[in-house]
Amino acid sequence: MNRHFGWIATLIVLGILLLLVMVQIDRQWQRMASMQNVMTEQARDLRALRRSLQGLESDLASGRFAGMDAGRAPRVDEVPSAFRRAAEAAGTEDYAEGDWLVQAFGTGLATITPYVSSDAYASEVQNYVLESLVQRDPQSLEWQGLLAESWEFDDSGTELTFRLRPGLQFSDGEPLTAEDVQFTFDFLMVDAIAVPRARAFLEKVEVVEALDERTVRFIFEEPYFDAMRVAGGLGVLPKHFYERYLDEPENFNESRGILLGSGPYRLEDPTGWTPDAGRIELERNPRYWGPVEPSFDRLVWRVIQNDSARLTTFRNRDIDVYGARPREYARLRDDEALRERADTHEYMSPTAGYSYIAWNQRRGSEPTRFADPRVRKAMSHLTDVDRLIEEVMLGYAERAISPFSPRSDQHNPDLEPIPYNVERALELLAEAGYEEKNRDGVLVNEEGEPFSFELVYFQDNEDTRRIALFLRDLYARAGVEMKPTPTEWSVMLENLSRQDFDAITLGWTSGVEVDIYQMFHSSQTVSGGDNFIHYENPEIDAVIEAARGEVDEAERMEHWREAERILHEDQPYTFLMRRQTLAFIDRRIQNLEQTALGLNLGFVPLEVYVPFEQQRHGQ
């Protein structure tokens, strides 16, 4: 009996001790949670203090004083409209500055020097460093001021005057004034500066005048429908930094990484980036003039050209975004490990660009077989785009009929896609002098030369490789020999500049309203121009010019639809498809949203962030 009582007493004591231990552990967890909250608040306070000190440093340097509340997040109603979405994000409960946004490019970049570079990858980087006078609201698509606080046209519609915000400065602390805007235009119009695309973009501008420190006027040759985009969208270069290259233009033209601006991020060394770095890294601009601080400490792009290596890097959490190809995406959507840490984003951007095959009509001084529109149209009839979309893209794309989106008012609804029709293609080729003469299935011309050409494509794009191989077999059935030619990105760009290729497959980005002057007007066949296929048609030249000079939107759309009809008949490109974006994005990236301009991941001012508790990287 006593022995049983002793065991019972022992168990009671042990139970009481266990209860006390559990209570103590619970208190310790509460203390740890409290300490974590305190540390989080302290980190936020430190970031606010840093923001205040940086603002004070900038204000003292520029002769301004921000006041005692410089460190607090601004209210939405206190900031210019271009910063309101960023201010809304900064006002959310879990918002925090800090961490890095790490992405990957599937190709190396030849240069990130502004206006010398010609690809979307360099433009993505420059977007965080250079700023323009205005930009579009992501939802309404209306223009809103960035560097400019106001603007107005004169009664003639040929003069557009901007008033700059006070206190603007570049990342090196030098003030940004109207003189820098004028310099940017003047610099780009110097013939020795090798920027033919920029000059074509600015062709309608006669002169830019700095009227005073904060007022700049663009004078156009005639009223121009796209005047706001041309003048307001010009990335402003600092005169004090770039003017040296007027005396040594070859150093600018051949440069790899001369990049300095007024944006929220900067290169640590604005002249020191080189392609062999294997990555591009931008740091927060401590002198940024904007009312909302950029959220990330650093933006990093790693160059990872192999798809498998890029996916492995994403799985290892070393990059935050993985753009998947259709076959991968279909497989990875059901990958439990990925679904736990990443969100899927599958969408067709309203301004999605298009892919195409461009048929070069002149090499050197000699016309090619593709100078004959019957040959080009035959090649479009031999290109089964619908099968490409289903078998290569797995349905994650839509047909492109022209440079204009089918949802755009520029599109002519009477036009139908060029159908896959081998019989019609052979008829057109026979009219152009290509027939089977040796009973070997190969088409030859009157001199007995086989219809054979090379199709250049980017070697590291698996989807494009599949498309090229698919088309090789398809064309061969009709007696046309196409040789797929995988090529490095830098070599492709050089081929374009020299216009040295038979055919090439690439893509163009798009916009709210697409001006096709640079791609299809005959004046743009110059070396380095975007009409790198030597397409020349006086009829479309006249229609493009009429559209560009028409400020009445309804009338202008009629001109664009006529231009589309001519392109549809001429087929300077075989228009392929508009692809959906298929992406996995690390779930710690917050405030992602679809807008009228697409996903807001790359918007500037920045709208996305990582809550403090989920941050991985220090400064």
Segments predicted by a language model, with ranges:
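N-terminal lobe/hinge region of extracytoplasmic solute-binding protein
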Residues: 86-87, 99-155, 186, 260-262
